């Protein structure tokens, strides 16, 4: 095993093998424990894209809320699933299939296009130009603004979908989809997440669909693996302590080092990870 590989595995808490049912229970109990400790909270809010990660996080959250209602008799415990399209979403059917699978208590829809376009126009008013990539990050951050607005109106906390295969590459928007209150998938790689969806009875297309952030107008539905330059299979193998090609390992480690700032709170004078 490569020296940095061992360090990364330890930092992200990845196990080489898992029991999916045990990990489902672990995440559900985690979500319930947070509510029991913070009794002022009654809802969890999650943006739903129609991909594997939000499908899994949503299913775990709904299960936690069902158990909270059963255990406390308090029907105020609700899971709010939020659709956050930029205009019309090409894979809207997948998003609705995910919502149907998870049986969300409440479903909301917020079209982020007007607010994103307004922000782009405001910044460009001085003659500067927002790149398509930068605009994609604005979309991700606007989605989180909407989720926190909904959570604020409903005594809620926001659920994030970050997992080990994203964390190692930093493949999320800082203070966008990377900004949340709880991340119940943290510690799981991509194939492990799919295994949890299988035991939860998810339709296969929800975890077999090619992962995409789908943030760029000029490159719609760009596969994550194309953007990263490495396959999720290699990322998962690396995180599980297996041998991968030097090229794959070097690509993963390059992303890990480049995106270290994303895995930290704002940097203070006491931090030295970046030096």
From Swiss-Prot:
One of its GO terms (molecular function) is NAD+ synthase activity. The keyword DNA repair does not apply. Mg(2+) binds at residues 53, 166. Signal peptide: none annotated. Its EC number is 6.3.1.5. Disulfide bonds: none annotated. GO terms for biological process: NAD biosynthetic process. Deamido-NAD(+) binds at residues 141, 174, 181, 261-262. Catalyzes the ATP-dependent amidation of deamido-NAD to form NAD. Uses ammonia as a nitrogen source. Homodimer. NCBIfam families: nadE, PRK00768.1. This is NH(3)-dependent NAD(+) synthetase.
């Amino acid at each position: 095993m490569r020296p940095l590989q061992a360090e990364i595995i330890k930092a992200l808490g990845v196990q080489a093998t898992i029991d999916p049912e045990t990990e489902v229970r672990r995440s559900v109990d985690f979500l319930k424990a947070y509510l029991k400790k913070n009794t002022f909270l009654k809802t969890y809010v999650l943006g739903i894209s129609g991909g594997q990660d939000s499908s899994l996080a949503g299913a775990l959250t709904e299960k936690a809320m069902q158990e909270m209602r059963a255990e406390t008799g308090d029907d105020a415990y609700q899971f709010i699933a939020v659709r956050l399209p930029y205009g019309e979403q090409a894979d809207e059917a997948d998003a609705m299939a995910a919502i149907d699978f998870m049986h969300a208590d409440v479903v909301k829809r917020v079209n982020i296009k007007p607010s994103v376009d307004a922000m782009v126009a405001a910044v460009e008013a001085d003659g500067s130009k927002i790149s398509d990539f930068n605009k994609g990050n604005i979309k991700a951050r606007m989605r989180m603004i909407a989720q926190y607005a909904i959570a604020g109106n409903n005594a809620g906390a926001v659920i994030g979908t970050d997992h080990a295969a994203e964390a190692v590459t930093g493949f999320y928007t800082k203070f966008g989809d990377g900004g949340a209150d709880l991340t119940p998938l943290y510690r799981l790689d991509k194939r492990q997440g799919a295994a949890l969806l299988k035991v939860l009875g998810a339709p296969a297309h929800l975890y077999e669909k090619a992962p995409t952030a789908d943030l760029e107008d000029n490159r719609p539905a760009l596969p994550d693996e194309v953007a990263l330059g490495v396959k999720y299979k290699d990322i998962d193998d690396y995180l599980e302590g297996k041998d991968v090609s030097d090229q794959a390992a070097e690509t993963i480690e390059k992303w890990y080092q480049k995106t270290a700032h994303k895995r930290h709170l704002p940097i203070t004078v006491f931090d030295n990870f970046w030096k």
